[in-house]
């Protein structure tokens, strides 16, 4: 079985090297330390904007048009929002599953 896919990294699990602007004004090197160096309001605003804009339905359309058949989505351990101060992201993952189904893509997840 051949799989043609793409990794949707830095959407639900942040990678500083892929989007340093999210870490602006901090010395945090990863998502674990980011909320300790920002006010709760600033942290929440950055995360919500990032998640709503970084990967969208349009990306799933593009992935399908490029001939891909699958996407890999790294998923954080705080996906359900039960690990303060982190903000859950199950709603975004639900959207991804809906978009994948709509465009005939398979999803692989990576739990962290």
Predicted regions and their residues:
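N-terminal carbohydrate-binding accessory modules
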Residues: 1-68
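Substrate-binding cleft and catalytic face of glycoside hydrolase catalytic domains
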Residues: 57-112
